[in-house]
Amino acid sequence: MKVRLDPSRCVGHAQCYAVDPDLFPIDDSGNSILAEHEVRPEDMQLTRDGVAACPEMALILEEDDAD
């Protein structure tokens, strides 16, 4: 599973950051600075929770067939 950010949709609610600041870093304005990456197995549920928390749907999960 990969997670990525659509920066044009992020307006700085920081709801993802509230789920887990280490998984969802933000800048000084509250906007996500998440870099696209493969999600570690131990982070899958928190990543799903952070993506679901975004009211602007700026975070995108790309599920692998095996997930």
Swiss-Prot record:
Residues involved in [3Fe-4S] cluster binding: C10, V11, Q15, C16, C54
Cofactor(s) this protein requires: [3Fe-4S] cluster
UniProtKB keywords: 3Fe-4S, Electron transport, Iron, Iron-sulfur, Metal-binding, Transport
GO molecular function, one term: metal ion binding
InterPro entries with a match to the protein in the record: Fe-S_cluster_ET
UniProt keyword Transmembrane, yes or no: no
Cofactor note: Binds 1 [3Fe-4S] cluster per subunit.
Gene3D superfamilies listed in its UniProt record: 3.30.70.20
Binding partners and assembly: Interacts with the cytochrome P450 143 with high affinity (Kd=84 nM).
Role, per record: Ferredoxin that is the redox partner of cytochrome CYP143, a cytochrome P450 encoded by an adjacent gene.
Official protein name in the record: Ferredoxin FdxE
UniProt source species: Mycobacterium tuberculosis (strain ATCC 25618 / H37Rv)
Lineage: Bacteria, Bacillati, Actinomycetota, Actinomycetes, Mycobacteriales
